Amino acid sequence: MKAFHTFCVVLLVFGSVSEAKFDDFEDEEDIVEYDDNDFAEFEDVMEDSVTESPQRVIITEDDEDETTVELEGQDENQEGDFEDADTQEGDTESEPYDDEEFEGYEDKPDTSSSKNKDPITIVDVPAHLQNSWESYYLEILMVTGLLAYIMNYIIGKNKNSRLAQAWFNTHRELLESNFTLVGDDGTNKEATSTGKLNQENEHIYNLWCSGRVCCEGMLIQLRFLKRQDLLNVLARMMRPVSDQVQIKVTMNDEDMDTYVFAVGTRKALVRLQKEMQDLSEFCSDKPKSGAKYGLPDSLAILSEMGEVTDGMMDTKMVHFLTHYADKIESVHFSDQFSGPKIMQEEGQPLKLPDTKRTLLFTFNVPGSGNTYPKDMEALLPLMNMVIYSIDKAKKFRLNREGKQKADKNRARVEENFLKLTHVQRQEAAQSRREEKKRAEKERIMNEEDPEKQRRLEEAALRREQKKLEKKQMKMKQIKVKAM
């Protein structure tokens, strides 16, 4: 009962409230006015919210630089229409896709995007401009090659210096015992013994010795390989060569007779015969074998006459040549030594070259390029052969017949030279005469005094007449002698 009583009280309260509510709307017109005002206020509020909210622009870009602009807040796309749009999209998705409907759509240029914004271009950076180690491979190779060249230069130069010093230390005692002066560099007016080698460059060392009987002096030249040059090192890998020691002894004129003689390897003698002036003129025959004198097959002989060969090939000389044949390149004795042939652009030279009585030795250093300082000791016996050859050249003398034959050979060489150069000498004399005449004519033409100019012309004419008369007298004398 208590619950029922409570329920009745609630109904009474609710009924009183509803009656108070409907008392405000006594007639129908009041209700209409209330409704219109309420909806008008609602519409004003909606319009204010639409105008106050700014339009938001969304720009989307795809990979082909196409721009799409979407505007939010337009009247035709209100929030109330979203549900209808969703239903329409659902219907369109279910419909089949028609290719002809969108034909030419993608080919249309999008003018709105080009007006609003410039197209974005992506520049491809070349590979050689990128910051990576691959971009500097050429520089790396150049730096590596430069470092290799510098290292090879230092190592090769130091090795040649060590080899030269090892040779000098080995031969110094022998040289000082046979020569008063060892190691003159030529910088002082007076000859002084420096006791050291003179370095010409990184692979050539010189040593001058003098102060011995029967010779003016001895020049020793150590010709090492160009170990400081990387390209030369690479070339020697394909064709090995040896270091060489060249010794040139200049004899006194009264201490050596007139002859030309050479012994050495066949290849070296053929080359010397083509290059050297004296061997090509006085030893025209091919190199002959030295088996007759007990020489190995690797050595051959070039000689002006047989008497010279018999006199030079004594027991001790044969001993040196036989035991050290692998180190001997050539041995060259000559009283007509003038060096290599003189090659001129315009024919033969007009004058015979100056000659010196010379002993020339060329030795190969053991090792075929792979030389060590200890290998220089093997060349010491060859220096003893040089000292012996100096004394041998002083003692050796040709007999009467050999002397006459040698003189005939030298006269023949001189005559052949004069015949070869006769035309050239005539041309040179003719050019000198023409130059003299031209200078005389210029002097006459430059003379301002007419009387003096006339006298000079008459004097020149008289000289020409006298020359013609002399030529005619010579021709008459020749005819009389012929008769």
From Swiss-Prot:
Coiled-coil annotation: which residues? 450-483
Task: Pull the Lumenal topological domain ranges from the record.
Answer: 156-483
Q: Look up and give the membrane topology term.
A: Single-pass type I membrane protein
Q: Output one GO MF annotation.
A: RNA binding
Q: Does the keyword Aminoacyl-tRNA synthetase apply?
A: no
Glycan-bearing residues: 178
Where along the chain is composition biased (Basic and acidic residues)? 105-118, 430-472
Q: Quick one: where's region Disordered?
A: 46-118, 424-483
Q: What is this protein called?
A: PAT complex subunit CCDC47
